[in-house]
């Protein structure tokens, strides 16, 4: 949890000088492609996938959390964390995956 908040602080510091529209220009379609490549081994990332190999939340459950924001998820993906492999995602890729997860919030 400490790493999660550290990631949020890093994200806020990195984007503090940017206006809201340019802080994260995310591409949800690209995020879906990345999620299928990097995340689908452990997470259920879309409706076509019925099962994952780890006991982790599906992306729909992440999207529906009351405190979900794409910014929080993107920051979490950038910062190394012990519960998940540390994928070499760029800030743009993390934002794209977070934007895709946001599309699942219904």
Write out the residue ranges for each language-model feature.
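Electrostatic cytochrome c docking/interface patches
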Residues: 16-34
